[in-house]
A protein has these predicted regions:
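Export/targeting segments at the very N-terminus of extracytoplasmic proteins
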Residues: 1-32
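Solvent-exposed, acidic/flexible segments
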Residues: 3, 13-20, 63-66, 92-100, ...
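Solvent-exposed, polar/charged alpha-helical surfaces in well-ordered, non-transmembrane soluble domains
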Residues: 4, 8, 21-24, 101, ...
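Peptidoglycan-targeting cell-wall enzymes and recognition modules
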Residues: 5, 31-119
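Surface-exposed patches in mature extracellular/periplasmic domains of secreted proteins
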Residues: 14-24, 35-42, 113-123, 127, ...
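Acidic helix/loop microenvironments that form the catalytic cleft of cell-wall polysaccharide enzymes
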Residues: 27-31, 73-74, 118-141, 202-217
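Non-catalytic cell-wall polysaccharide-engagement segments
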Residues: 79-169, 173
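Short acidic, glycine/serine/threonine-rich helix-capping segments at coil-helix boundaries
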Residues: 166-181, 185-218
Length: 218
């Protein structure tokens, strides 16, 4: 996936320029920005074969401990989330835009303090370091290499070249209507006095943000 394509999605997702460059640097260190790459030495399949097998349920993608994709997601719950989002979007688990969306989703859900930092910081080095240590958590914290990649993209992608995507990176809806209905029923069943009629099938983040807001307001 091209660096600028990733940069545009990350910026549209709220990351500052430094935050987006820091994430790009980490992705480059993890995967070389190859969206369908499977961890070297962990599978005998080619990247294309592994991706096709994952999409068709021919391998235990969630539990096989093979790092995969732009961020080399490895842990089973993270890979499961990736797979579920891919199915809901109707795209391959190797889709690059999907993976950028999922990284942003994880930041919002699981790393809110880091997300707030990445949306406001102008420090590329610190952004790169924190993503490595808090989000990626590799066996070896090669911080300098990740910083180097990030600054390389700083020279390659000028701020004047940034143009927000006109449309969402992925147009398919998530979650599907049955999932939205399940959220409504769960709220009602558990006695929450929330307005649930506002849910409708649409962008994953808009649905989940409404759900979280409803929970806070109950």
């Amino acid at each position: 996936m091209k660096a600028k394509e990733i940069y545009d999605i990350l910026r549209a997702g709220g990351l500052s320029r430094a935050g987006a460059l820091g994430m790009l640097g980490n992705m480059a260190a993890e995967s070389g920005l190859k969206e369908n790459i499977a961890q070297r030495g962990m599978t005998k399949l080619s990247d294309e074969q592994y991706t096709a097998a994952a999409d068709n349920g021919l391998i235990d993608f969630v539990n096989d401990s093979v790092g995969y994709g732009l961020c080399q997601w490895t842990f089973r719950t993270r890979k499961q989330g990736r797979m579920e989002m891919a199915k809901s979007y109707g795209v391959s688990v190797g889709d690059g835009a999907l993976q950028c969306d999922y990284a942003l989703f994880e930041l919002r859900r699981d790393y809110p303090a880091l997300m707030r930092f990445l949306c406001t910081t102008d420090d590329i080095d610190l952004a790169s370091d924190r993503i490595c240590m808090e989000f990626e958590r590799p066996a070896v914290n090669n911080l300098q290499a990740r910083r180097g990649y990030a600054h390389g993209f700083e020279d390659e992608i000028t701020e004047s070249s940034y143009h927000p995507p006109i449309k969402d990176p992925i147009q398919a809806t998530f979650p599907p209507d049955p999932t939205v209905l399940a959220l409504q029923l769960w709220l009602n069943y558990n006695g929450y006095a929330c307005e649930t009629n506002g849910y409708k099938s649409g962008n994953f983040f808009s649905v989940m943000e409404k759900f979280i807001a409803d929970m806070k307001n109950c």
